[in-house]
């Protein structure tokens, strides 16, 4: 909600629905004022003006505790066993190989680790392991360039998932032994599916890739922490990814 006109639209929409209460997972005073003007009596919200130092998991947990809900920080997604078996058959997934999800997409350019980093990691794994890589990404032009670059070198051992829906991809992820993902939707989905997930953190707070016990964050070389505007995608080290990969699957 970035303009007065947009705020007016939101106020009308909210008021027309006659809500009794609202939950605002944000510290914005603007959202609170819109809800008050719309006549909502009970407003549950993160503490105001605390966004900069806010712990996104703890803030949400404390907010939900106000209505006696206790939520863990390790969300889980359940996939029907029959769908997992069906994906195994449809994609000829072999348990004799290490099946690896590569989440190569991302919501912004600064989150998209360059193709050469993934290719170097693939090259390292092939020296010691027999692997199949499932490439999960969207249709964004930059994402497609990353996808094509990887396929140009490793087409025989890579399967692209960019034409599959999320519901089709979930059982495939569940068949994987491990995932290596940018900070993207696939890192969260993979971890929630109880698959060990190495998260490549280049430009967002470390917490986003470490809140789950299934997440193993990798940060750029030369940095002790990572946050918004770290711009570290060129400093992600494939050898560090491989070292973490070996420690997880061994």
Regions found by a protein language model. Give the residues of each.
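Single conserved hydrophobic/aromatic residue that forms the stacking wall/gate
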Residues: 1-6, 10
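Mid-sequence helix-capping/hinge segment at a functional interface
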Residues: 40-111, 115
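Donor-binding and catalytic core of enzymes assembling or modifying cell-surface/extracellular glycoconjugates
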Residues: 117-203
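Nucleotide-sugar donor-binding patch of glycosyltransferase catalytic domains
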Residues: 49-50, 188-250
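Glycine-rich phosphate-binding loop signature in dinucleotide/nucleotide-binding domains
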Residues: 14-19, 93-96, 129, 175
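Glycosyltransferases and closely related glycan-assembly transferases
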Residues: 12-22, 31-43, 192
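Short N-terminal targeting/anchoring amphipathic segment
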Residues: 15-27, 176-181
């Amino acid at each position: 909600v970035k303009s007065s006109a947009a705020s007016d639209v939101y106020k009308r929409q909210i008021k027309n629905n006659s809500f009794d209460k609202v939950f605002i997972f944000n510290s914005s005073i603007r959202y609170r004022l819109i809800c008050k003007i719309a006549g909502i009596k009970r407003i549950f919200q993160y503490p105001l003006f605390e966004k900069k130092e806010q712990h996104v998991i703890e803030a949400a947990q404390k907010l939900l505790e106000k209505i006696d809900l206790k939520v863990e920080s390790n969300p889980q997604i359940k996939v029907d066993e029959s769908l997992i078996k069906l994906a195994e058959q449809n994609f000829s997934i072999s348990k004799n190989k290490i099946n690896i999800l590569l989440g190569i997409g991302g919501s912004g350019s600064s989150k998209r680790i360059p193709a050469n980093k993934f290719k170097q990691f693939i090259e390292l794994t092939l020296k010691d392991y027999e692997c199949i890589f499932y490439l999960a990404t969207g249709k964004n032009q930059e994402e497609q360039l990353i996808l094509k670059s990887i396929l140009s070198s490793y087409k025989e051992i890579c399967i692209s998932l960019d034409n599959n829906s999320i519901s089709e991809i979930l059982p495939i992820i569940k068949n994987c032994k491990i995932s290596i993902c940018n900070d993207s939707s696939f890192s969260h989905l993979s971890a929630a599916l109880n698959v060990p997930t190495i998260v490549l953190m280049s430009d967002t707070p470390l917490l986003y890739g470490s809140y789950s016990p299934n997440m193993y964050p990798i940060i750029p070389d030369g940095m002790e922490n990572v946050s918004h505007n770290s711009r570290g995608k060129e400093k992600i080290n494939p050898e560090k990814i491989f070292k973490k990969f070996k420690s997880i699957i061994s």
